[in-house]
């Protein structure tokens, strides 16, 4: 399954059962949790024009588009939620790159506490990256995704740097005969670029993994523990979350 868990025919199952496929770390909910305030409305019949100009009704559209979950909040109150057979309020569902925003939120907490300084260089926290694309870049560059690197985020890649990244992070199987040194070893070899840091935005998933590494190094605990402590507990989270790990225990942020 590790070779095809993101393929359309099994993705809806695997997105709800990732902990059976990959190493993960639990992130504790609040104790006690806080219940959502609600002002529920039935929005199934809400109509809108889709990208083709055709009129759709929300409930039918969510089912036809193979959505798993959908929620509407207004003024801090839950107005509407919708679940397919692959979603439920207490079911853990992968959120992919939403984790990047969550990691930045956690970094903001540590910045506010004086633990992380956005003006310092990344290598002040992670000297291991001194010979990678991250050399000379600041934490501000990292948070803004303005790191100059030769990494290409190519989701169709089958044998290049992006596939190597997926294998290093345990999202794809290691080929027979290949060596797996893990995600953080991959980050130490991040390909460099002739461009200067801070000159353009470059969306690059490994940057968030570097941020997760800085968070662990500066925060003195695992990403999962720090996220539980500083985000899930204060916001009153009702259910446990998790984050996937590589085979060495590094979080895939």
Describe these PLM feature segments:
Residues 76, 94-118, 142, 211-215:
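Active-site SXXK
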Residues 77-82, 121-124, 158-196, 222-240:
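Short, charged, amphipathic alpha-helices and their helix-cap/turn boundaries
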Residues 89-93:
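Loop-to-helix entry region of an early transmembrane alpha helix in multi-pass inner-membrane enzymes
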Residues 197-200, 252-253:
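Active-site rim elements
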Residues 96, 201-203:
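Catalytic tyrosine of NAD(P)H-dependent dehydrogenase/reductases that use a Tyr as the general acid/base
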Residues 1-88, 113-116, 144, 148-150, ...:
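N-terminal leader/targeting segments and the immediately adjacent pre-domain N-terminus
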Residues 60-61, 81, 105, 109, ...:
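Residue-level signal for well-ordered alpha-helical scaffold segments within enzymatic catalytic domains
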Residues 94, 112-155, 189-192, 206, ...:
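Active-site helix/loop module of the DD-peptidase/beta-lactamase fold
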């Amino acid at each position: 399954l590790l070779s095809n868990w993101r393929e359309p025919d099994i993705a809806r199952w695997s997105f709800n059962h990732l902990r059976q496929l990959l190493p993960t770390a639990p992130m504790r909910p609040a104790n006690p949790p806080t219940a959502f305030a609600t002002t529920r409305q039935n929005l199934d019949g809400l109509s809108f024009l889709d990208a083709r100009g055709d009129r759709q009704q929300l409930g039918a559209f969510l089912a036809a588009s193979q959505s798993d979950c959908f929620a509407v909040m207004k003024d801090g109150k839950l107005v509407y939620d919708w679940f397919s057979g692959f979603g439920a309020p207490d079911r853990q569902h992968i959120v992919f790159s939403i984790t990047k925003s969550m990691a930045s939120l956690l970094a903001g907490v540590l910045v506010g506490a004086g633990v992380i300084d956005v003006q310092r260089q990344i290598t002040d926290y992670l000297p291991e990256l001194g010979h990678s694309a991250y050399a000379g870049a600041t934490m501000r560059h990292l948070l803004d995704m303005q790191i100059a690197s030769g990494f290409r985020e190519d989701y169709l890649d089958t044998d290049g740097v992006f596939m190597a990244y997926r294998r290093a992070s345990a999202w794809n199987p290691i080929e027979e005969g290949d060596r797996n040194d893990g995600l953080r070893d991959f980050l130490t070899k991040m390909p460099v670029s002739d461009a200067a840091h801070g000159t353009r935005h470059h969306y690059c998933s490994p940057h968030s993994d570097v941020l997760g590494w800085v968070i662990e190094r500066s925060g003195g605990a695992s990403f999962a523990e720090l996220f539980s402590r500083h985000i899930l507990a204060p916001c009153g989270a009702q259910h446990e979350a998790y984050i996937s790990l590589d085979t060495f225990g590094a979080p895939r942020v």
